[in-house]
A protein has these predicted regions:
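Active-site-proximal region of nucleotide-activated glycan assembly enzymes
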Residues: 126-148, 280-318
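Catalytic cores of nucleotide-enabled group-transfer and carboxylate-activating enzymes in metabolic
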Residues: 218, 227-228, 246-256
């Protein structure tokens, strides 16, 4: 443990106490510090986290405009590593600077799509988890993270679109696409979609066919119940780890299934790309509290009654 502490102290001094270091050396030292903490699974105490967050923020305020694309991405990645699973509130100070870095990255048409997506997910998560005011944070994320990322995808022509149209000669096929199928904890989206599936089963219609596409982790105890619904077809894409491969697989399956209406519920970069790919002729965003996605590929919003007034105040649903 003493060796770990000594190494950590050495890396800290290299990052923040070397007066002769330029911004490139400081950036590299921050990256090495974050890698060391992550690889050794070190849990930093709150006073240390507060010092680190303040030092990184000071560095970005002074030198953020000097960083190149690789360095901006490395800093975002380093903060994500230091942030870890404890989600200490001391990192909130970094939100404005990380948003600046992300918007700068998203404005670069030559930025690799994987880097843009990773940076989007990391900055989004930090902003969301550090919120104080739900309404203001939602608006901040929509305008400064979601929309720049959506515009970036438009500029790089990320549009492997499906061109199917709703057929009048078959059942209407509705697909719920969910990242984490769970009803445990505070994950409202999973509970909402689970309730909708139950409703479809109990009110079985000969004119509607229901699909459930699961793209991430699944609460195993839910599957036997959902699989017993004779009018719900489940497709699990969890084992496709590569995001590009998963998108292509989902796109092909949706086209083969002839999905008419796609309903999704999350803001992950992958979900934005699913919508951008136009997996169905009609696409909807199901909101369990977050303000509506204002991207052209979302045709309708499904909002709970108690959320409608709040959402309308931010962005009027079409």
């Amino acid at each position: 443990m003493n060796n770990l502490a000594e190494t950590l102290n050495h890396l800290y001094q290299a990052a923040f106490l070397n007066d002769a270091a330029d911004h490139k050396h400081i950036c590299q030292a921050i990256v090495e510090l974050a890698n060391f903490v992550s690889q050794n699974q070190i849990t930093l105490d709150e006073p240390t986290v507060e010092i680190l967050a303040r030092k990184i923020n000071d560095f970005l305020e002074q030198c953020g405009h000097l960083l190149d694309v690789s360095e901006k991405y490395s800093i975002i990645r380093s903060v994500q590593q230091l942030y870890g699973k404890k989600r200490q509130k001391q990192f909130k100070i970094l939100v404005p600077q990380l948003i600046k870095l992300f918007k700068s990255l998203a404005s670069d048409n030559n930025l690799p799509e994987e880097i843009a997506s990773n940076a989007y997910d990391w900055v989004f998560a930090l902003c969301w988890q550090q919120m104080d005011n739900f309404h203001d944070t939602s608006l901040l994320i929509k305008e400064n993270i979601v929309e720049p990322y959506s515009n970036y995808l438009d500029r790089i022509r990320f549009r492997p679109q499906t061109t199917t149209k709703i057929s009048q000669s078959k059942k209407i096929k509705i697909c719920y696409l969910i990242q984490h199928f769970s009803v445990s904890g505070s994950y409202a989206n999973g509970r909402a979609i689970y309730s909708l599936l139950q409703g479809h089963f109990l009110n079985n219609s000969e004119d509607i066919e229901i699909y459930l596409y699961i793209t991430g982790a699944t609460e195993i105890s839910l599957l036997p119940t959902v699989l017993s619904y004779n009018n719900v077809i489940v497709r699990n894409f969890e084992n496709h780890s590569n995001s590009s491969e998963k998108l292509e697989k989902i796109r092909k399956v949706a086209e083969k299934d002839q999905i008419d209406i796609l309903i999704t519920e999350m803001y992950f970069s992958s979900n934005i790309k699913y919508l951008k790919s136009r997996l169905a002729p009609v696409q909807m965003y199901l909101s369990c509290g977050f303000i509506p996605l204002t991207i052209p590929e979302v045709d309708y919003y499904l909002l709970f009654n108690n959320l409608f007034d709040d959402a309308r105040g931010c962005s009027r649903p079409r």
